[in-house]
From Swiss-Prot:
It catalyses: L-homoserine + ATP = O-phospho-L-homoserine + ADP + H(+). ATP binds at P78, V79, A80, H81, G82, L83, G84, S85, S86, S87, S88. This is Homoserine kinase. Its EC number is 2.7.1.39. The lineage of its organism: Bacteria, Bacillati, Bacillota, Bacilli, Lactobacillales. GO terms for biological process: threonine biosynthetic process. Gene3D superfamilies: 3.30.230.10, GHMP kinase, C-terminal domain. NCBIfam families: thrB. Pfam families: GHMP_kinases_C, GHMP_kinases_N. Pathway: Amino-acid biosynthesis; L-threonine biosynthesis; L-threonine from L-aspartate: step 4/5. It comes from Limosilactobacillus fermentum (strain NBRC 3956 / LMG 18251) (Lactobacillus fermentum). It is an enzyme of class 2 (transferase).
Length: 286
């Protein structure tokens, strides 16, 4: 059995902790068979190979007496780079328990459990459902709605350094002035409306008007402003900080990608630029 889980990019600017998109970097888990104890083969630095691995931990939260198995894990998703690596591992663990434990979970149940672990749906919901998803907590549960996908390439600038989510969370303000909070909420609301109506000129403007987190985290990702300027010169729709960073995501037409890549090289920015596409289906099992 093979479980494939996409990466994800959260926030899309002002959609803090509520908007996310599944992307074409993949986490693959091959279930090789039962074993006397959990064995997780992988080549990812500083991640455990036994039952303390996040994939196994998550599966055992759903089914505590799950039979140990030998797993082989491969991942294109860089750890601690704002591309949902931990969320993808959590979703892989949920699907592992679902399959081995014959739980027959619905997507809604998977999203609910994943959100309980993560605390918010912006990464886990698109990872499960695929595409672009908007969600929030409602009356103790979680609601998630799929939105139309923007017809753009997601160009991920991935720096060599990482940013731990805990560090990025610590940079956030504990409160916002009421007037600022109203403006931030209105921007996010209008972004959602523009996504559903396909007004992508407005989408591009609103993605770059975040008031919740990007300014507070700018010192952690100093390339953000320069990448946004380079993107504008190359015809990009918008640039935003992916999740907690440090990955910076730029939406642009596929034809504009070579010019954007050349501009980054000319500017001497050392990170990798990776062209990504939305992953339409989310987690799959074969």
């Amino acid at each position: 059995m093979q479980i494939i889980v996409p990466a994800s990019s959260a926030n899309l600017g002002p959609g803090f902790d509520s908007i996310g998109v599944a992307l074409s970097l993949l986490l693959t888990v091959d279930v090789l068979g039962p074993a006397t104890s959990w064995q997780v083969d992988h080549q990812l630095a500083d991640l455990p190979h036994d039952e303390s691995n996040l994939i196994v931990q998550t599966a055992r939260q759903l089914v505590p007496d799950l039979t140990p198995h030998h797993l082989a894990v491969q991942s294109d998703i860089p750890v601690a780079h704002g591309l949902g690596s931990s969320s993808s591992a959590i979703v892989a663990g949920i699907e592992l328990a679902n399959q081995l434990g014959a739980l027959h979970l619905s997507n809604e149940q998977k999203v609910a459990f994943a959100c309980q672990l993560e605390g918010h749906p912006d990464n886990v919901a698109p990872t499960i459902l695929g595409g672009l998803v908007i969600g929030t907590e409602v009356n103790g549960g979680f609601a998630a709605v799929k939105a139309p996908l923007p017809p753009y390439l997601f160009a991920a600038y991935i720096p060599a350094y990482n940013v731990k989510t805990k560090e990025a969370r610590a940079a956030l303000p504990t409160t916002l002035p009421f007037k600022e909070a109203v403006a931030a909420s209105a921007t996010a609301n209008t972004l959602v409306a523009a996504l559903f109506t396909g007004d992508y000129q407005l989408v591009g403007q609103l993605i770059e008007q975040d008031r919740f987190h990007e300014q507070a985290r700018a010192h952690l990702v100093p390339e953000l402003t320069q990448l946004r300027e380079l993107g504008h010169r190359c015809g990009a729709l918008a640039t935003y900080l992916s999740g907690a960073g440090p990955t910076v995501m730029t939406l642009l037409k596929e034809a504009d990608f070579p010019a954007f890549q050349a501009a980054i090289t000319q500017a001497g920015l050392p990170g990798r630029l990776v062209p990504l596409t939305p992953h339409p289906t989310g987690v799959t099992v074969s």
